[in-house]
Amino acid sequence: MPRSLKKGPFIDIKLEKRILDMNSKGEKKVIKTWSRSSMISPDFVGHTVAVHNGKNHVPVYVGDNMVGHKLGEFAPTRSFRGHAGGGKAEKGGSAPRKK
């Protein structure tokens, strides 16, 4: 369920302050954050934010099409490596044919 419009978007105060300071200075550094629930505002465009995925920080370059989404959407927390590969059937079918 989406957040109520009267409340406004959640953006971590310290993260927003760091972005605004960098915008005023014209700097482009990677910013580490643990705030996956922060909404991406138009001020974030052009910056790289390293979002924590539970194990390490994933660098996310913020583009203009990401505005309105949350930072955590771009740093996956689960890695799927495929199903177990054992017990593969012989080539040519599983059961012998009847004549």
Swiss-Prot record:
Pfam families: Ribosomal_S19. Signal peptide: none annotated. It comes from Pelodictyon phaeoclathratiforme (strain DSM 5477 / BU-1). Keywords: Ribonucleoprotein, Ribosomal protein, RNA-binding, rRNA-binding. GO terms for molecular function: rRNA binding; structural constituent of ribosome. This is Small ribosomal subunit protein uS19. InterPro entries: Ribosomal_uS19, Ribosomal_uS19_bac-type, Ribosomal_uS19_CS, Ribosomal_uS19_SF. Protein S19 forms a complex with S13 that binds strongly to the 16S ribosomal RNA. One of its GO terms (cellular component) is small ribosomal subunit. Residues 76-99 are annotated as: Disordered.
